[in-house]
Amino acid sequence: MASSITPRVVPAKPAGDETFDSAAYARRIIRDARTAALATTDSETGFPFLSSITTSTNRKGKVLFLTSLVASHSRNMRHDARVAVMFQIDESDEEWAAKRPMFQGRLTLSGKAHVTDDATDIEDFLKAHKKLTIAVKQDGFAIWKLDPMGVDMMAGPRLAPELSIEHLSSN
């Protein structure tokens, strides 16, 4: 059962409500996020490279994201498919999160990304981002699919469960 690719130094113990469904919360973060941070390894220097991406999920809950093929992160992923994607959703209207941005849910998936030309994936991405239809249909853009290999979720001191990739599959 794979958890984080980068194990925590100190194991995190779940805090707060024992009935809280952290797996469902993780799936919600991924599904509701419209953008995310993408970490790749620069193909020329080997240094980490971080950028923003537009995200959605397909019908199976797999992460999809759009990039311009001339962007640095696209070049990097063609050279080394290993990536990390960090999702965060705005929960500032929740009483427990008000004025505490680090209490809000954030989740990092580590894995490998590949360009998908599956018609269903493209349809699912465009359903979430209708205004990007023209960009997607141009040759200079691609939709990528993430094959996750590790997951790490933090939501401040109230919640930091150990999750596995298997937890992200909905029943």
Predicted regions located by residue number:
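Well-ordered beta-strand positions in beta-sheet-rich domains
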Residues: 50-52, 106-110, 162
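Short, structured beta-strand-loop surface elements
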Residues: 9-12, 72-131, 138-141, 148-150
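Residue-level recognition of conserved structural "scaffold" positions that shape functional pockets
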Residues: 53, 118, 163-165
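An N-terminal domain-cap segment
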Residues: 3-4, 9-78
